[in-house]
Swiss-Prot record:
Organism: Prochlorococcus marinus subsp. pastoris (strain CCMP1986 / NIES-2087 / MED4)
Protein name per its UniProtKB record: tRNA dimethylallyltransferase
UniProt cofactor(s): Mg(2+)
GO molecular function annotations of the record: ATP binding; tRNA dimethylallyltransferase activity
Catalytic activity: adenosine(37) in tRNA + dimethylallyl diphosphate = N(6)-dimethylallyladenosine(37) in tRNA + diphosphate
Entry EC number(s): 2.5.1.75
Keywords, comma-separated and alphabetical: ATP-binding, Magnesium, Nucleotide-binding, Transferase, tRNA processing
Purpose: Catalyzes the transfer of a dimethylallyl group onto the adenine at position 37 in tRNAs that read codons beginning with uridine, leading to the formation of N6-(dimethylallyl)adenosine (i(6)A).
Gene: miaA
Positions contributing to substrate binding: 15-20
UniProt xrefs under PANTHER family: TRNA DIMETHYLALLYLTRANSFERASE
Binding sites annotated in the UniProt record for ATP: 13-20
Amino acid sequence: MFQPKPLVIVLIGPTASGKTELGIEIAKYFNLNIHNVDSRQLYRFMDIGTAKPTKEQQKTIKHFLIDLEEPSSQVNAKQFQEIATKSINRELNQNRIPFLIGGSGLYMNSIIKGFFAPNVPPQKVLRSQFEKLGQEKCWELLKICDPVLTKKINYADQVRTIRALEVFYVTGKPISSQKFQNPPPWKILELGLYREDLKERIFKRTKNMFEFGIIDETKKIINQYGSNLPLLETIGYREAKDVIKENLKLEKAIEITTTKTIQFAKRQKTWFRNKNNPIWLNNKNLLKDAIINIKHALR
């Protein structure tokens, strides 16, 4: 007897496009829980700099896949895929519809398309050596080892740069050539969110981020885990760290973070258009358009 595939709803879009707010409204309407697919929100204490759903928002709607690990841990896409798939299957076993929200294209596609990279365990000695080299030299190495990947990830993304070098040094092959696909047995509805005023939204969010605590948040992380944490080299935290060290003025930190975030958002948009091809929601009535598409998928 034919068994229809279970539905999994996905909302993707660039950073600062309003995924969290829209996602919560959708979740309320359909009585859904939310699975956050974000490469930084899965770490504890990184709240302001990652625009993590607030405690109030988490009380309104149950959120999964956030605050899972210490910032000193390094979870790769393969590990996240395994954690997320278990979380999704738990919901499916309860006859609920999983709802995934995120802007991390690599992590999202590892889940919904079944892409996975070689399962190379963390190499502590190698990682330590790469961290001592610094991101600039590691990036130059990566351009030699895996030029394909350097066109897909942010040059300031130390976590993914080191992971890619780690895989290359262990296997002798670039990570971009070792990805395989094993699609999960789900029916995927992909909704895309993009705002025409995204640059203005990014500037406003970055300004608020610095005004409302990313510097204090960064200080606390440094005090507990040290200043060499790879996650502190990601957008926002790197600039906050430079303010703390008095290497940057606050205004310049906001400017640099805004520019980096706009560049990152452009790459996200390109990724989603090329790799995902979602149903892009109508900006004039996002919630209504999302509801119509979800109801259609539920028929």
